[in-house]
Structure formats: C-alpha cells, structure tokens
Amino acid sequence: MGSTLENQVALVTGGRRGIGQEVARVLGNEGALVIATATTSKGAEAISANFQASGIQGHGVVLDVTDDAAMDACLKKIQSEHAAPSILINNAGITRDQLLLRMKDEDWDAVMATNLRAVYRLSKICLRDMLKARFGRIINITSVVGSMGNAGQSNYAAAKAGVAGFTRALAREVAGRQVTVNCVAPGFISTDMTEGLSESHKEALLQQIPAGRLGSVADVAGAVAYLASPQAGYITGQILHVNGGMWMG
C-alpha cells in the first residue's frame, strides 16, 4: 500500500462497480480514507466488505446524487465521523440512450440530473472546506462521447460536455486556493457491458482505437490517482483523455 494520499479523505460517487470501484480501491491503496457511494444498502454493504477484505480505510454509503437533502446529509455525516473530503471524485452516471426524435423528456432530464447537476451540487458543498484548507482535488469522470459525440446519446454527450465546461470554469475560480479541478475522460472501457457485445461489434469498436484494445478500469483509475496526488498540484482545468488514441482533440 502506498502513502501518497495519507491523511486525505476521498469521496467517490458510483463506487459499487466498474470505474468507480477501481478508483476507490486505488485511492485506498494510496493511503486515503475512502467513502464510496452506492444507490442501495446492499451495494454500500458490499463496498464496506470489499474495503475490509483489502485493508482499505473507509466504507460504503447509500447516496442518491439527484437528492439535494441526501447529499447535504451525506457530507455532514462524513465530516462528523471522519473529516471533510479533500478529494472528490464525481463518477456516478447513467445513460438513457435513444435517437433524439424518439427521446422522452424524462430521459433527457434524468441524464442531466445525475451526470451534470450532481457534479455541480456535490462540488459546491465540498468546496467550502477545501478552500478553507487551501487544498483540494475535484476530479470529474467525463467521456470521450462528450468530445466526439455518439448517435443515440445526445443527452449523455451534452451532459459530459457540460461537465468539461464546468470543470474549466471552476478551475479558474479556485486555483488561487490550491484546489485543482480536472476531468478524466475514458474511451471504450472493458466492462460487463462490453463483454456482452458480439465479436463483430467488438471488432468495429477496435477499428476506431489506434491502441488496438479496449481500455481497462485500471487505466482510468491510474489517471485519477495521479490527478489526486501531490505531484499533480500544478495541473488544473484539464481534460485527461484515456482512450487509446481514439480521440486526440
């Protein structure tokens, strides 16, 4: 276990599986006390059990990132039981894919609420303590789709592009207090979802990726861990693409 994040408290949303789970594990292995969120009690309990088995400080909590009162209560509990988060990883996200002419208003609104508004709200309530401490790391998980678009994902692309703009604006506001704000933008990452794709679909994806392979959750978590580290204190307002060369803009 490393110690580059010793004495730091990290809040990771969407920490039950996939990228969020690996980010929480890596930050914990670097010495941070990690609070990772899930949408159900069962999910939060699984996070806590995984942490205990791995020797990671921290635990899982239930959080609906679209519920302002729940976010406020979650932060107050973390502050009272541990300390204010000095690292915030806004990872929770959903998709509601559909061609625009078939997309329902509620599908647009749901994606915006979870993928964009929650980033604004959690960043806002965590920021005050970071500014007082004159240290903080806010890392938002976006997507290559926010840069290049993808048919059937106008809601998701708009939300992720919005997070990128939010990140750059906030970075300018808080840089003088030693708080950095950055994005990590994954490309196509190997997950349970991609494992279920047909071989022809996988091949079509790989043809778009110069590296010739799908990314791993470890690829993404490594980028997040670097941006959270003391060594990244002079990096802010950046979008770090982790996509095997699929997007180079």
Question: Whereabouts are the PLM-identified features?
Answer:
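Conserved glycine-rich cofactor-binding loop
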Residues: 16-17
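Conserved glycine-rich Rossmann-like NAD(P)H-binding loop of the short-chain dehydrogenase/reductase
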Residues: 30-46
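Substrate-binding pocket helix/loop in short-chain dehydrogenase/reductase
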Residues: 99-100, 104-112, 194, 205
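Active-site helix of classical SDR
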Residues: 123, 159, 167
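Alpha-helical segment proximal to the catalytic Tyr-Lys
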Residues: 128, 172-176, 233
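Residue(s) in the substrate-gating loop at a strand-loop-helix junction
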Residues: 143
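Short, small/polar-rich loop/turn modules that mediate ligand/substrate recognition or access, typified
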Residues: 175, 180, 235-237, 243
